[in-house]
Amino acid sequence: YQLYAKHHAEFTADEIYILSKELDTVIYFDALSEVSVRVSHDLFVSKKRINFDVDSVDKVIESFMSKDYIRIREIDSFLAFPSVGYEWNEYMLESFLISYSKKFVLLNNGQSLHNVAGAIVKKDGKIKEFEDACAAVLSESRIELKKSEALNYLADVNMITRRSYKDLD
């Protein structure tokens, strides 16, 4: 996947999906993230084509943080984010957090071609593990803490990308 991304300045999510079928493998998002930025649901671009003002973006993210974490989908307005030549959205935010942020990290159970999920936490904060972020989200919910209800809730609030997660007990 990294080799594909290195040889394509731009490529689409559909092209990656087709590649995964041709290779008969899952999509290795970590390899893609090494050399590309997902700038929208449909488009990935080379890291060489985008320049983030990391401190400014981190400052905007910090303005959304009122506790130890926020769900990535809680950032639903991108007007305050600095211009980077592409319109800001949750996919670009996910890429920024994975590859660029100095202050924040995205905790999730993996990336998805169709969804952005997880929690944004401070790198020097109390929450270090994805399971701890899920526990914090569930502790603030009013659901009965049974595994199926917890999984449904975490999927509904975009903490997990699918309604299964083996490490949730």
Named regions from a protein language model:
Residues Y1-D169:
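C-terminal non-catalytic scaffold/interaction domains in large multidomain proteins
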